[in-house]
Swiss-Prot record:
Subunit structure: Acetyl-CoA carboxylase is a heterohexamer composed of biotin carboxyl carrier protein (AccB), biotin carboxylase (AccC) and two subunits each of ACCase subunit alpha (AccA) and ACCase subunit beta (AccD).
UniProt protein name: Acetyl-coenzyme A carboxylase carboxyl transferase subunit alpha
Pfam families assigned to the protein according to its UniProt record, in alphabetical order: ACCA (PF03255)
Gene name for this UniProt entry: accA
Keywords (A to Z) from UniProt: ATP-binding, Cytoplasm, Fatty acid biosynthesis, Fatty acid metabolism, Lipid biosynthesis, Lipid metabolism, Nucleotide-binding, Transferase
Amino acid sequence: MASYLDFEKNIQQIDEDIINAQIKGDTEAVSILKKNLEKEISKTYKNLSDFQRLQLARHPDRPYTLDYIELILNDAHEIHGDRAFRDDPAIVCFMGYLGEKKIIVIGEQKGRGTKDKIARNFGMPHPEGYRKALRVARLAEKFQIPILFLIDTPGAYPGIGAEERGQSEAIARNLYELSDLKIPTIAIVIGEGGSGGALAIGVADRLAMMKNSVFSVISPEGCAAILWNDPAKSEAATKAMKVTADDLKSQGLIDDVIDEPTNGAHRNKEAAAVAIADYVKKSLNELENIDVRELSANRMQKILKLGAYQEA
């Protein structure tokens, strides 16, 4: 059964009316209601607020990494473990084909259903997850296979065990190593891009965001709690933080925004997957014509342009 957000109540009502009309066999009413539904969807999604886009980024029905892997990757084989501690299921790694191109996909997976969410720690990786991602990235470099990173996490796990095993070192190591990979790399924020947990697999030649995804240094709730001591002010924090794809594109922090189906990726996963696949194919066609040493140098220059600082 579909889940609806607060601002989708009118859409929910029309959907329910359509179901009732179908049960009654009233084809004329169904036809009219479907036209009304299209108008309501267009009206609702035309001018979404930043907070509404945040809600969409967290929508429980939104496609996750494994959904996209199933939809866009052929002959997919999962790669497990960091070869040091354990296999962190919050990060998944697959080798397969995108069309006729070999590709490795590394992404964060939140999980569906209570048991799966707990097993995957709600998409919050431990350090061994980031070390698994780095191991697979090095494997990709060894065999000259491009990488697609799919980012979707509230953030890196802040628990005691994660800190004891070197969470900050694992993230920093990934930033260092991924910035110098001698292969084409693409990163896409498909839902939430939570701080260092997202950056740890977000260093790439192309960084894009789905239209209804977000990317921030802290959650709006966390920001509101710190600035105003009131998590209820998260809507104001969301707007002030400029977390949306359009905001980050206008500031030059990402390269591209990938359009979603009109009513969000959660309503048409197949169309969202096609949009991602098309973007990746287009980007790879461009990147594969650039010498790998030049790719690495360009990536480093791109990183150095971020933020405002002065060298001593």
